[in-house]
Amino acid sequence: MALYEHVFLARQDIAPQQVDELLKTYKNVIESHGGKVERTENWGLRSLAYRIRKNRKAHYVLINIDAPAAAIAEMERQMRINEDILRYITIRVEKHEKEQSAMLSRPDRDDFPGKDEERPRPSRRQYEDVVEGGVE
């Protein structure tokens, strides 16, 4: 059997419990085809780089899998059918990483300090005065 890393993105408007149910469903698909899920990581709700199907955020989930190709094909087929899955990618790897992934240790773009603070912005009149070279 081959080793795979699989990441899928679920819609932002579903509850975290529904994401866990999706994970459980795909885990059962893998196990029913003779594979096993070695590790899962739920990266939580994160911002997307661009909108996907009108979603600006998504629930990210990583699955480390040891399974035959038929199990992966069936899981991907079911993901294509499910409307809650925005994107997925499966990559074959030589070995699985033992420590937690870099995504878990990296803060989300929304977590940076000062993001929600409003910065003072000059009014249009103040801006025009600065551009013209003189301040009244």
Curated annotation (Swiss-Prot):
Region (Disordered) location: 97-136
Entry GO CC: cytosolic small ribosomal subunit
Protein name: Small ribosomal subunit protein bS6
Annotated InterPro entries: Ribosomal_bS6, Ribosomal_bS6_sf, Ribosomal_S6_plastid/chlpt, Transl_elong_EF1B/ribsomal_bS6
Source organism of this protein record: Bartonella bacilliformis (strain ATCC 35685 / KC583 / Herrer 020/F12,63)
Superkingdom of this protein's organism: Bacteria
This protein's UniProt keywords: Ribonucleoprotein, Ribosomal protein, RNA-binding, rRNA-binding
Compositionally biased intervals (Basic and acidic residues): 97-128
Any Pfam family: Ribosomal_S6
GO biological process: translation
Function: Binds together with bS18 to 16S ribosomal RNA.
CDD domains with a match to the protein in the record: bS6
Lineage per the UniProt record: Bacteria, Pseudomonadati, Pseudomonadota, Alphaproteobacteria, Hyphomicrobiales
PANTHER family xref list: MITOCHONDRIAL 28S RIBOSOMAL PROTEIN S6, SMALL RIBOSOMAL SUBUNIT PROTEIN BS6M
MF terms (GO), sorted A to Z: small ribosomal subunit rRNA binding; structural constituent of ribosome
Keyword Ribosomal protein: yes
Family: Belongs to the bacterial ribosomal protein bS6 family.
